């Protein structure tokens, strides 16, 4: 229920304590009702909150002892579904026992019988140990990966990039670049720059105009070279 919450959250911790404490008393009342019905005992709140009710020399006292021990088993399942952390089970078990001790102290005074203390400590240990075992098994359960497999099998469409049309980025175009360059050598880009002194330079790029990464051959003709070619 609260497994995904790992950060310190006082409201969450208080909610867990109250939930476990309420379930502890609800389950204890239900167990006492069943046992009292079986052994013809009278159900009362004194069985829960008076330390004198737990004793070994009367049938009602033994019924209350049995009810507290059985309730510790059910309390461990409360830890499994509410706490869900094995390292926190002992803390919550001790908290439940301490709160019950405070309530009993307020209702009937400070507990003075060894039997009451023994039953409470044994119940706390049972609740903590079984709760840790159940929570540990839940923590070690395999995570279902069916949804992850479905997501992995979904095809992902990647929009084409403007650079994919480049011959260097595209292996098919790159393999045909050499053959296409021989057929497109007639595409010549010329740029003439006239200087202020009347001399001019002509830059001719010969290559594949469709391949921007093709090596460019430069031919620089000065004004004197052009005059020599004209005389020849």
From Swiss-Prot:
Pfam families: SYS1 (PF09801). This is Protein SYS1 homolog. It is a multi-pass membrane protein. The chain crosses the membrane at residues 12-32, 63-83, 90-110, 114-134. Its main location: Golgi. Residues 163-211 have a biased composition (Low complexity). Residues 220-232 have a biased composition (Basic and acidic residues). GO terms for biological process: Golgi to endosome transport; Golgi to plasma membrane protein transport; protein localization to Golgi apparatus. PANTHER family: PROTEIN SYS1 HOMOLOG (PTHR12952:SF0), SYS1 (PTHR12952). Belongs to the SYS1 family. GO terms for cellular component: cytosol; Golgi membrane; trans-Golgi network. Involved in protein trafficking. It is found in: Golgi apparatus membrane. Keywords: Golgi apparatus, Membrane, Protein transport, Transmembrane, Transmembrane helix, Transport. Residues 151-232 are annotated as: Disordered.
């Amino acid at each position: 229920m609260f497994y995904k919450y790992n950060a310190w959250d006082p409201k969450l911790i208080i909610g867990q304590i109250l939930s476990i404490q309420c379930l502890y008393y609800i389950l204890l009342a239900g167990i006492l009702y069943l046992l009292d019905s079986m052994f013809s005992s009278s159900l009362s709140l004194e069985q829960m909150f008076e330390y004198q009710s737990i004793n070994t020399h009367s049938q009602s006292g033994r019924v209350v002892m049995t009810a507290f021990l059985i309730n510790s088993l059910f309390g461990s399942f409360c830890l499994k579904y509410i706490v869900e952390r094995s390292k926190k089970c002992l803390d919550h078990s001790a908290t439940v026992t301490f709160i019950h001790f405070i309530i009993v102290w307020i209702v009937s005074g400070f507990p003075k019988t060894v039997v009451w203390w023994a039953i409470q400590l044994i119940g706390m240990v049972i609740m903590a140990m079984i709760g840790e075992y159940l929570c540990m098994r839940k923590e070690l359960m395999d995570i279902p990966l069916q949804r992850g497999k479905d997501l992995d099998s979904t095809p992902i469409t990647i929009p084409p990039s403007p650079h994919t049309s480049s011959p260097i980025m595209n292996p098919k175009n790159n393999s045909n670049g050499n053959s296409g360059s021989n057929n497109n050598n007639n595409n010549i880009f010329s740029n003439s720059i006239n200087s202020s002194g009347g001399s001019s330079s002509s830059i001719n790029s010969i290559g594949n105009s469709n391949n921007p990464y093709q090596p460019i051959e430069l031919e620089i003709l000065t004004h004197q070279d052009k005059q020599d070619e004209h005389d020849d």
